[in-house]
Amino acid sequence: MIVLVVNSGSSSIKYQLLDMDNEKVLCKGLAERIGIPGSRIVHKKDGEKFVIEHPMANHDEALQLVLQTLKDEKMGAIKDFKEIDAVGHRVVHGGEKFSGSVLIDDEVINAIEEFSYLAPLHNPPNLMGIKAIMKLLPGVPNVAVFDTAFHAKMPKKAYLYAIPYEYYEKYKIRRYGFHGTSHRYVSRRTAEILGLDYNKSKIITVHLGNGASIAAVMNGKSVDTSMGFTPLEGLVMGTRSGDLDPSIVTFLIEKEGLSPEEVYTILNKKSGVLGLTSNFSSDMRDIEDKALENDPLCRLVLDIYEYRIAKYIGAYVAAMNGVDAISFTAGVGENSPITREEICENYLSYLGIKIDKEKNNVKGEERIISTPDSKVKVLIVPTNEELMIARDTKEIIEKGIKKLEY
């Protein structure tokens, strides 16, 4: 089965074409700067990179060009669009309605539109991609895989905020969590690597990219996660503040004469690592480099970053009453030996964790980095959200079902 995976953003579209008989990536790419000057597709096949400079006024035009690229004699991997058996779409927010991946129909499209108020920057462009593909590939089934779905069945004690209950009833204000597809892939893969029964395991997944979140996965289910109503809650991130006292918002509005929208922008785009370093960088690689050169501010920022992560890990050990394994993933999680080592050695030794420094001193390679006698196993597991989306798509189509429950 050939599955096309589409991740449609506001001005870019990531795509992968996979042969799901062997889970091989046939080709992949990124259509970027959609609707603005300088639009292009960066396409990769068999390790070779192609750059296609071409105007793309909207998502329809971008995906039309992507499809043409997929069947191009030199760059493509198919000869006819009929070879594409199904399309899997990343959708950021599924609200409370979707706790698993679903076959897309009019009802699903309406629901994604309905939840756009919860993810105004993400759901509308996700929908543009879905509608464009349905127009360009009529008759090909489409599947939606939601970032929030893995966390949708968290217990109420984990997802409700201690605010008047009527706001949950009226507006569905609750903790939703994000990066669900990544947490699901990494936790499953962790169990496979260690030979654990996924449905009888306690795994903490640590997704550290520019956006970052942690999940407690108990017996194959997400029971808690650090992001909340929006992706702003939780860890210190590249440009996001993570947890903070809500009264800071009203304080800044009053003292700085800012609008609520301006404060929201500050907390989302100008805070986190970027804000703490006075706009030096939002990239943890830059912070680490400076910290290793004994820059006091960057050393402090690295400490704050690691401390917040360690606190959440400790909280989730308590939430699950134990832990079998901790897995690091995404840009920082996969590629920062110093962050992994310092979190584990400075804060988690009470769990009986011991890190093998030689095994830890790698980047982006799947492996166990704890010692054989470590009471809790620690791993690097590179995430693969596209493969997870393709697997869900294949399962729904092959089984002829409308919904896949996790």
Curated annotation (Swiss-Prot):
GO terms for biological process: acetate metabolic process; acetyl-CoA biosynthetic process. GO terms for molecular function: acetate kinase activity; ATP binding; magnesium ion binding. SUPFAM superfamilies: Actin-like ATPase domain. Its cofactor is Mg(2+); Mn(2+). PROSITE patterns: ACETATE_KINASE_1 (PS01075), ACETATE_KINASE_2 (PS01076). ATP binds at K14, H207, L208, G209, N210, G211, D283, M284, R285, G331, V332, G333, E334, N335. The record marks H179, R240 as: Transition state stabilizer. InterPro entries: Ac/propionate_kinase, Aliphatic_acid_kin_short-chain, Aliphatic_acid_kinase_CS, ATPase_NBD. Mg(2+). Can also accept Mn(2+). Its EC number is 2.7.2.1. The active site is at D147. Keywords: ATP-binding, Cytoplasm, Kinase, Magnesium, Metal-binding, Nucleotide-binding, Transferase. Gene3D superfamilies: 3.30.420.40. The keyword Membrane does not apply. Substrate binds at R90. Pathway: Metabolic intermediate biosynthesis; acetyl-CoA biosynthesis; acetyl-CoA from acetate: step 1/2. GO terms for cellular component: cytoplasm. Mg(2+) binds at N7, E385. Homodimer. Belongs to the acetokinase family. HAMAP family: Acetate_kinase (MF_00020). Catalyzes the formation of acetyl phosphate from acetate and ATP. Can also catalyze the reverse reaction. This is Acetate kinase. It comes from Thermosipho africanus (strain TCF52B).
